[in-house]
């Protein structure tokens, strides 16, 4: 059994492994980690937000942190090889790789990387994320980047998949207006609060997704000190854009599509200019049940 007695704490009550400071992302880039309940639309949100930043003239890098490696396919219009798979091919001798082996250009110049992950039941997702950032630094691929977006697996907030929080300035939480999504969001708020003790990451806000209304999200925000930064209703064009393997900015400019595009552009502008770090105060599980009307 592995001992945890001598491990440095990484947030109260945590035995997460501290990130090597040598693989931090350079100061100057805006680094955003996108979290949320599994299947809530994080990859769609991340890719469209990356596209929006690029429309504002920013150099953008999106890093998919999911073994499914499907974060960036609406940007690249294909499934790209993962960093971990490519490293395995060269027996982890990263010096043998070229940037074109693992980094791919997508819509409007957005650069795309899929970190991938270890086989099911083995390894650690945090290690893979760390190796990805290390590889990007070794090839000097972060030096001229304005915005980095980490699109992170599900609502997992263990030491592994919480690793992107150690690089991020802000975390955006994608949620729907339902109990399960908000319950997952509360757990993520707890993880961010723990990470903020030792790292620069702060809560940037909430993205309401696939929801006509936001009344339950608003209740939660009011109790916990969060703020909704963008609201994307259940617009069919967003679903169809994913089926077409493209971003919302490549869809026919109908009234609904233009409205969604403008909301993404507004979110990107606010993250660049107006975002205020939030001091989130997570609720206990029972408090969420009571808040959202369960007996």
Curated annotation (Swiss-Prot):
Entry binding sites for ATP: 39-44, 68, 209-210
Pathway: Porphyrin-containing compound metabolism; chlorophyll biosynthesis (light-independent)
Record's keyword annotation contains S-adenosyl-L-methionine: no
Keyword terms of this UniProt record: 4Fe-4S, ATP-binding, Chlorophyll biosynthesis, Iron, Iron-sulfur, Magnesium, Metal-binding, Nucleotide-binding, Oxidoreductase, Photosynthesis
GO MF annotation list: 4 iron, 4 sulfur cluster binding; ATP binding; metal ion binding; oxidoreductase activity, acting on iron-sulfur proteins as donors; oxidoreductase activity, acting on the CH-CH group of donors, iron-sulfur protein as acceptor
Residues that hold [4Fe-4S] cluster according to the record: 124, 158
EC number(s) per entry: 1.3.7.7
PROSITE patterns cross-referenced by the UniProt entry: NIFH_FRXC_1, NIFH_FRXC_2, NIFH_FRXC_3
Enzyme class per UniProt: oxidoreductase
GO biological process, one term: photosynthesis, dark reaction
Cofactor remark: Binds 1 [4Fe-4S] cluster per dimer.
Reactions this protein catalyses: chlorophyllide a + oxidized 2[4Fe-4S]-[ferredoxin] + 2 ADP + 2 phosphate = protochlorophyllide a + reduced 2[4Fe-4S]-[ferredoxin] + 2 ATP + 2 H2O
UniProt function note: Component of the dark-operative protochlorophyllide reductase (DPOR) that uses Mg-ATP and reduced ferredoxin to reduce ring D of protochlorophyllide (Pchlide) to form chlorophyllide a (Chlide). This reaction is light-independent. The L component serves as a unique electron donor to the NB-component of the complex, and binds Mg-ATP.
Record protein name field: Light-independent protochlorophyllide reductase iron-sulfur ATP-binding protein
């Amino acid at each position: 059994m592995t001992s945890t007695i001598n491990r440095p704490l990484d947030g109260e009550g945590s035995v997460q492994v501290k990130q090597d400071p040598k693989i931090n992302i350079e100061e100057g880039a805006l680094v955003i980690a996108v979290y949320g309940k599994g299947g809530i639309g994080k990859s769609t949100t991340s890719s469209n937000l990356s596209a929006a930043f690029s429309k504002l003239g920013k150099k953008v890098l999106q890093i998919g942190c999911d073994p499914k490696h499907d974060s960036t396919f609406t940007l690249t219009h294909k499934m790209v090889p993962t960093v971990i798979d490519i490293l395995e091919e060269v027996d982890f001798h990263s010096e043998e790789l070229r940037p074109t082996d693992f980094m791919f250009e997508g819509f409007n110049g957005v650069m795309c990387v899929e970190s991938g992950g270890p086989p099911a039941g083995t390894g650690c997702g945090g290690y893979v994320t760390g190796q990805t950032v290390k590889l990007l630094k070794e090839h000097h691929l972060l030096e001229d980047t304005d915005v980095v977006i980490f699109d992170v697996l599900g609502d997992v907030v263990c030491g592994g998949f919480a690793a992107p929080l150690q690089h991020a300035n802000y975390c955006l939480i994608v949620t729907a207006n339902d109990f399960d999504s908000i319950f997952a969001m509360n757990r993520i708020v707890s993880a961010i609060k723990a990470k903020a003790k030792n790292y620069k990451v702060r809560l940037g806000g909430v993205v309401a997704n696939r929801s006509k209304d936001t009344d339950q999200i608003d209740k939660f925000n009011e109790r916990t000190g969060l703020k909704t930064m963008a609201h994307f209703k259940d617009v069919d064009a967003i679903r169809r854009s994913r089926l077409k393997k493209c971003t919302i900015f490549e869809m026919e400019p109908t009234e609904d599509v233009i409205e969604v595009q403008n909301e993404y552009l507004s979110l990107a502008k606010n993250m660049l200019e107006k975002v205020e770090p939030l001091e989130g105060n997570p609720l206990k599980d029972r408090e969420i049940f009571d808040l959202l009307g369960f007996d």
